[in-house]
Swiss-Prot record:
Protein name: Argininosuccinate lyase
Biochemical pathway: Amino-acid biosynthesis; L-arginine biosynthesis; L-arginine from L-ornithine and carbamoyl phosphate: step 3/3
One Pfam family linked to the record: Lyase_1
Gene behind the chain: argH
Tagged with keyword Lyase: yes
EC id: 4.3.2.1
């Protein structure tokens, strides 16, 4: 037989008996929402101050509530607070302790407030603060890439498509590609903060309240731009959580692409980079191994963060307005994604700064795979006036000849090239080096070292203001 208890919950006035033990277990969220304690106290302090200012509660009650909440915050921070599953969540745990500390005045704190708008403001505050931390972490990662890009603006490496050698680029240019990616991530963070910068506190359960509250006062006290404008939406909205998870998933995708490249580049077969000992591990059986575990774990975090996004999208997809208990399941997804994104960004910033770049190996690889074939085609267009499609065909024949000879394009003799097109002159050989190739790519956003340095200057100014 299931266990029944008399109802002593704060909401239990209309219940003749308490919840089943299993109900208590499934209903409790204190195991994870205790993470919101600071935001819950912050919101309650603002709410209590507003209640006093508007004359809804007495100044003496407000003073007791304020002192009690500050005592509770100190107890939690010092590890002296006892959390109870029977009290369900962080809100009830704090309110119960407040009643122990100050007595009946504690019961006035919840005037003109519901747990629906209470949790909405707590969670929104937490996500907003987490987004600010994410922005700072992304700035640090971007700065790490700018440092490496500046150092290697002219370091030649192969550019790839389909993971096949395509054209020479510079390592600095490759680093700047990630600056662009993480710069977009940073923009998404800033956009998300702007969109969510409204306070739901005062929406009450769903319909607002008949008390003469001042929602603008609490919004300002909590650092929001303004209060939300619809009480139904205020308590049922979790777009800010979904948007956080969405931008986290996109950012994690960028981190995963970078991690994959680091894993590949650090293999002996590529040998482009060497990870520092600080971000590597060894093997329990093979003493020679140096494994890129940090990069691999960052790559794996992407699946976890993507899963959190899909989970919350699925939770929210069919909920009628306004609040449903399903929404209690939102927090663990966001907490987990935030923790793992923060860890992944920090790990990647450390790896990027500590990477040892093998300039010689990169340059050697840059010249392989007939990477200057496009330069030959471009020369045929510019110098001989060939239509590009014809130049493409001529170059293809030159590549086939070089392959049959097992030499690079630049190692073909002038006579061999002229056997394909008699108009080719010795001038062409000056355009078939990897250095000349990257230097010639001077178009806006190109890989020429001078253009890479220009983009670095642009991003340094932009990041300083971000």
């Amino acid at each position: 037989m299931s266990e029944q208890k008399s109802s002593n919950q704060m909401w239990g006035g209309r219940f003749a008996s308490g919840p089943d033990a299993i109900m208590e277990e499934i209903n409790a969220s204190i195991g994870f929402d205790r993470k919101l304690y600071a935001q819950d106290i912050q919101g309650s302090l603002a709410h209590a101050a507003m209640l006093a200012k508007t004359g809804i509660i007495a100044a003496e009650d407000h003073k007791q509530i304020e002192n009690g909440l500050k005592t509770i915050r100190k107890e939690i921070e010092e590890g002296k607070f006892t959390f109870s599953r029977k009290l369900e969540d962080i809100h009830m745990n704090i309110e119960a302790r407040l009643a122990e500390l100050i007595g009946p005045a504690a019961g006035r704190l919840h005037t003109a407030r519901s747990r629906n708008d209470q949790v909405a403001v707590d969670f929104r505050l937490w996500v907003k603060q987490e987004l600010e931390k994410t922005a700072a972490a992304l700035k640090n990662l971007i700065e790490a890439f700018l440092e490496r890009a500046e150092e290697h603006a002219a370091t030649v490496m192969p550019g790839f498509t389909h993971l096949q050698t395509a054209q020479p680029v510079t390592f600095g240019h490759h680093c700047m590609a990630y600056v662009e990616m993480f710069g977009r991530d940073l923009s998404r963070v800033r956009d998300a903060i702007e969109r969510m910068d409204e306070s739901p506190l005062g929406a009450a359960a769903l319909a607002g309240t008949g008390f003469p509250i001042d929602r603008h006062m609490t919004a300002k006290a909590l650092g929001f731009r303004e209060p939300t404008r619809n009480s139904l939406d205020s308590v049922s909205d979790r777009d800010y959580a979904l948007e956080f998870l969405s931008l986290a998933a996109i950012c994690a995708g960028h981190l995963s692409r970078l991690a994959e490249e680091i894993v590949i580049w650090s293999t002996p077969q590529f040998n482009f980079v060497r990870l520092s000992d600080a971000f590597s591990t060894g093997s329990s059986i093979m003493p020679q191994k140096k494994n890129p575990d940090a990069a691999e774990l960052v790559r794996a975090k992407t699946g976890r963060i993507n899963g959190s996004l899909v989970a919350l999208l699925t939770i929210m997809k069919g909920l009628p307005l306004a609040y449903s208990k399903d929404m209690q399941e939102d927090k663990e997804q966001v907490f987990d994604a935030a923790e793992n994104l923060e860890l992944a960004i920090a790990a990647m910033a450390g790896m990027v700064r500590d990477l040892t770049v093998n300039v010689a190996a990169m340059k050697k690889a840059a010249g392989s795979g007939y990477s200057t074939a496009t330069d030959l085609a471009d020369w045929l267009v510019r110098t001989l006036g060939l239509p590009f499609r014809e130049a493409h065909h001529v170059t293809g024949r030159a590549v086939a000849l070089a392959e049959s000879r097992k030499v690079d394009l630049a190692k073909l003799s002038l006579e061999e090239l002229q056997s394909i097109n008699p108009a080719i002159t010795a001038e062409v050989f000056g355009y078939l080096t990897v250095e000349k190739s990257v230097k010639s790519r001077q178009s806006f956003g190109g890989t020429a070292p001078q253009e890479v340095r220009r983009q670095i200057r642009y991003w340094k100014k932009r990041i300083a203001k971000a």
